[in-house]
């Protein structure tokens, strides 16, 4: 009796709308991607984050967010704050983060939903949310 064998190669190329930044510049992943075969014959791709977005914030927005964070956390001039800086690594606790978001809302004239506010942990994420809300507002 003859046997039949086949190999299938599947390549997944994410679209630009589904891309998200895996590394925060420190070599660690910021989210986990899982491949799950489940009960179907086709795999499904899940991420640990509910929503991710592509970096689209303007440099001016990022710089302004950096200034606000440095002021709120009373960071010295020698402390380097970049788009990849995490609030917690700059010394912010959860209350500081809430106050930072409130300062950003006031400065940019926006209202950040609680769900989005909880997902903000870096300068870049804050700037992306601000840009997104300003676009909707215009």
Curated annotation (Swiss-Prot):
The keyword Ion transport does not apply. The modification O-(pantetheine 4'-phosphoryl)serine is found at residue 94. GO terms for cellular component: chloroplast. Transmembrane segments: none annotated. Residues 59-134 form the Carrier domain. 4'-phosphopantetheine is transferred from CoA to a specific serine of apo-ACP by acpS. This modification is essential for activity because fatty acids are bound in thioester linkage to the sulfhydryl of the prosthetic group. Gene3D superfamilies: ACP-like (1.10.1200.10). The keyword Plastid applies. Keywords: Chloroplast, Fatty acid biosynthesis, Fatty acid metabolism, Lipid biosynthesis, Lipid metabolism, Phosphopantetheine, Phosphoprotein, Plastid, Transit peptide. Pfam families: PP-binding. Carrier of the growing fatty acid chain in fatty acid biosynthesis. Belongs to the acyl carrier protein (ACP) family. This is Acyl carrier protein 1, chloroplastic. The gene is ACL1.1.
